[in-house]
């Protein structure tokens, strides 16, 4: 259930994002989901990669500031209100979501990557409410 996400801190300059994608592509590492957030000084690239430990090593060797973070992925119907229902369940159980990003591959379902404040509690709550979590191995294969 727990997925290793890479968080890469990028200087705000042309080409840095391309360097990351080029390094991982050359190493045969696929990026199945990603989000890029910007601040005035740097960007944060969060991604799920097919081989997170290998990607971490490659990026560190290239002198990127990078770390692994535990996240989970909720498989949800891709329809109005589905995310709100899941978040209502979590907030009702006092589970705080630090951030999330989502993607859809078939327009019927959406995969929502979640970074909760308490990952084990979040998993328990979602499973107790019969919500489907995507396994790490499935995420890494996408």
What positions do the PLM features span?
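A conserved regulatory-domain signal marking ACT and ACT-like small-molecule sensing domains
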Residues: 1-142
């Amino acid at each position: 259930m727990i997925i290793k996400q890479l968080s890469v801190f990028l200087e705000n300059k042309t080409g840095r994002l391309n360097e990351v994608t080029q390094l991982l592509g050359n190493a045969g590492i696929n990026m199945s989901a990603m989000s890029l957030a910007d601040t005035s000084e740097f960007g944060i690239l969060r991604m799920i990669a097919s081989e997170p430990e290998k990607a971490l090593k490659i990026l560190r060797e290239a002198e990127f500031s990078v770390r692994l973070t535990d996240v989970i992925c909720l498989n949800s119907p891709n329809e109005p209100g589905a995310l709100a229902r899941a978040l209502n369940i979590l907030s009702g159980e006092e589970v705080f979501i630090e951030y999330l990003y989502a993607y859809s591959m078939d327009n019927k379902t959406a995969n929502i990557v979640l970074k909760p404040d308490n990952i084990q509690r979040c998993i328990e709550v979602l499973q107790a409410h019969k919500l489907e979590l995507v396994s790490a191995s499935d995420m890494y294969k996408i």
